[in-house]
Regions:
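Short alpha-helical patches at coil-to-helix transitions and adjacent helical residues
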Residues: 31-35, 89-90, 152, 156-159, ...
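Short, intrinsically disordered, charge-balanced linker/junction segments flanking boundaries
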Residues: 1, 187-194
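Rossmann-fold NAD(P)H-dependent dehydrogenase/reductase core
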Residues: 1-128, 135
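C-terminal helical subdomain
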Residues: 85, 134-186
Length: 194
């Protein structure tokens, strides 16, 4: 049995491709892989257990498009694909939390923050700075501090906080960042990421 499952496999901004199962690479890896694994082992989570799905602030790039998850009708855009997969992680978290809370198991989606890892290997360094500039514009509009890279312990902190420290009711079905519940995106207030 498990106390906590942290679903943390992921790729970002990959060239267009498909998984061995035929799904667009990012959606298949970042969302469907977690979805299948977690649902196969969910019964092993003890009462009081938690599921932590690693998502990203990149969920803001796109909603999920279940009519065209493999980009068969729309041009492939790496960050749109990444956003779709990370939004799907959050929506899965909300549904998992609703489905399992009666048995004492809760779920949270976590944005670990920006950290320099192999995750960004497909991104040109000049594009990275453009992304940071865009993030900082959004943060400034929200009255928040500018982006800073995190260390590995800082990156892990929100997963540990949501999985072990925060109250279950505080994090259940919610999106967390910087060891707090994240800001609500108004369009999703009643039916999605909270």
């Amino acid at each position: 049995s498990f106390d906590v499952i942290i679903a943390n496999a992921g790729v970002m901004a990959t060239p267009f491709g498909h998984t061995a199962d035929g799904f667009e690479t990012q959606f298949g890896t970042n969302h469907l892989g977690h979805f299948v694994l977690v649902n196969r082992i969910a019964r092993l989570l003890r009462a009081g257990g938690r599921l932590i799905n690693l998502s990203s602030s990149g969920h803001r790039y796109s909603n999920v498009d279940l009519q065209d998850p493999n980009f068969e009708r729309t041009p492939y855009e790496p960050f749109v694909a990444y956003g779709r997969s990370k939004t799907a992680n959050i929506l899965f978290t909300v549904a998992f939390d609703k489905r399992h809370r009666d048995r004492g198991v809760r779920a949270a989606a976590v944005h670990p923050g920006g950290i320099k890892t192999e995750l960004s290997r497909h991104i040109d360094p000049s594009h990275t700075q453009a992304i940071i500039d865009q993030i900082n514009r959004h943060l400034a509009a929200e009255g928040r501090a500018p982006f800073q890279w995190k260390t590995i312990p800082q990156e892990a902190a929100t997963s540990v906080w949501a999985g072990m420290v925060a109250s279950a009711d505080e994090i259940g079905g919610r999106y967390c960042e910087n060891c707090h519940v994240g800001h609500i995106v108004p369009d999703f207030e009643h039916h999605g990421p909270r």
